[in-house]
Swiss-Prot record:
Taxonomy, superkingdom: Bacteria
Keywords (A to Z) from UniProt: Amino-acid biosynthesis, ATP-binding, Cytoplasm, Glycosyltransferase, Histidine biosynthesis, Nucleotide-binding, Transferase
E.C. numbers: 2.4.2.17
The name this protein goes by in its record: ATP phosphoribosyltransferase
Complex and partners: Heteromultimer composed of HisG and HisZ subunits.
Cellular location(s): Cytoplasm
GO biological process, one term: L-histidine biosynthetic process
Entries under PANTHER family matching the protein: ATP PHOSPHORIBOSYLTRANSFERASE, ATP PHOSPHORIBOSYLTRANSFERASE ATP-PRTASE
InterPro entries to which the protein is assigned, alphabetical: ATP_PRibTrfase_cat, ATP_PRibTrfase_CS, ATP_PRibTrfase_HisG, ATP_PRibTrfase_HisG_short
Gene transcribed to yield this protein: hisG
UniProt keyword Transferase present: yes
């Protein structure tokens, strides 16, 4: 049995064409089913649904043989014990700094002000601001980042941005682009040795179906 870890939402939806290229289709809609383990049209392949931030953990410790997760999750939480054969070029977005539209971020940085920054990417944010010599106090949040500048909790946020519509709707503007993000295929190293042929076939099928830029 080969177990693939996925999270619900955009990554799940955009992984489906890649699975189809490998001759694998999930037999139930995760949005309608309460099951966390989903069967597929291949009796030897199943999909487990976990939180996006937990995908690398399941793969690293052998709860899943393969997984699809964002580069942001891998960089923030570490990627030990995993093979990363493919950038799948799906779920593309960017990690950015955003502030209120009326906040002069450039002046604050130039003056050496100490900024309060809200984010769930504390490690990546710390590394980014340290590289620029900007002093920050980081506030860990798990969602609704846009509220932080609006309520005075923080001067800025570091979050994923796709279209920018959510920022615009909340009167925020993107002021720095930290990095581009996309989903990666990750594979448990022990599983790759023990189940080499079936896993290799899935990797090759994914590779052939990756969207072109």
């Amino acid at each position: 049995m080969i177990t693939l870890a996925l999270s619900k939402g955009r990554i799940f939806e955009e992984t489906m064409p890649l699975l189809a290229a490998a001759g694998i289709e999930v037999t139930e809609d995760p949005e309608k089913s309460r099951k966390l383990i989903l069967a597929t049209t291949r009796p030897d392949v199943r999909v487990v649904l976990v939180r996006a931030s937990d995908v690398p953990t399941y793969v690293q410790y052998g709860g899943a043989d393969l997984g699809v997760t964002g580069l942001d999750v891998l960089l923030e939480n570490g990627n030990q014990g995993m093979y990363q054969p493919l950038d799948l070029r799906i779920a593309a977005c960017r990690l950015s700094v955003a502030v209120r539209a009326d906040y002069d971020y450039a002046s604050a940085v130039k003056q050496g002000s100490r900024l309060r920054v809200a984010t769930k990417y504390v490690g990546l944010a710390r590394e980014f601001f340290a590289s620029k010599g900007v002093h920050v106090d980081l506030i860990k949040l798990y969602g609704s980042m846009e509220l932080a500048p609006l309520t005075g909790l923080a001067d800025a946020i570091v979050d994923l941005v796709s279209t920018g519509n959510t920022l615009k709707a909340n009167h925020l503007v993107e002021v720095e682009r930290i990095m581009d993000i996309s989903a990666r295929l990750v594979v448990n190293q022990a599983a790759l040795k023990l189940k080499r042929e079936p896993i290799r076939r899935i990797i090759d099928a994914f590779a052939s179906a990756i969207p072109t830029a």
